[in-house]
Amino acid sequence: MSTYDQIEIEDMTFHPDSQMFTYPCPCGDRFQILLDDMFDGEAIAVCPSCSLMIDVIFEKEDLDEYYEEAGIAPPQPIAAAA
């Protein structure tokens, strides 16, 4: 899957109320990706108005500050049943 561009997480806008990162798309809309999806390993932000996607560059540890800004705790891993 090819992406339109690679964007650093610091260059995106974080919206604490929706826990979503956005970045301007050339079509006039915005690429979107949810904080929890990034925590789960997703790194592709999609524009809801066109077919473009961007690759978001981040380290999982970077997400802690955004959870703090949103006033929520990061998801806890689910323990496997023995």
Swiss-Prot record:
Pathway terms, separated by semicolons: Protein modification; peptidyl-diphthamide biosynthesis
Binding site for Fe cation: 25, 27, 47, 50
GO biological process per UniProt: protein histidyl modification to diphthamide; tRNA wobble base 5-methoxycarbonylmethyl-2-thiouridinylation
GO-annotated molecular function: 2-(3-amino-3-carboxypropyl)histidine synthase activity; ferrous iron binding; iron chaperone activity; oxidoreductase activity, acting on iron-sulfur proteins as donors; zinc ion binding
Cofactor(s) the protein requires to work: Fe(2+)
PROSITE patterns, alphabetized: DPH_MB (PS51074)
Catalytic activity field: [3Fe-4S](1+)-[protein] + Fe(2+)-[Dph3] = [3Fe-4S](0)-[protein] + Fe(3+)-[Dph3]; 2 [3Fe-4S](0)-[protein] + 2 Fe(2+)-[Dph3] + NADH = 2 [4Fe-4S](1+)-[protein] + 2 [Dph3] + NAD(+) + H(+)
One of the record's GO cellular component terms: cytosol
Location(s), subcellular: Cytoplasm; Nucleus
Keyword Metal-binding: yes
Transmembrane segments: none
Top-rank taxon: Eukaryota
Primary subcellular site in the record, as a coarse category: cytoplasm
Domain note: The DPH-type metal-binding (MB) domain can also bind zinc. However, iron is the physiological binding partner as zinc binding impairs the protein electron donor function.
Name used for this protein in its record: Diphthamide biosynthesis protein 3
Taxonomic source organism: Candida glabrata (strain ATCC 2001 / BCRC 20586 / JCM 3761 / NBRC 0622 / NRRL Y-65 / CBS 138)
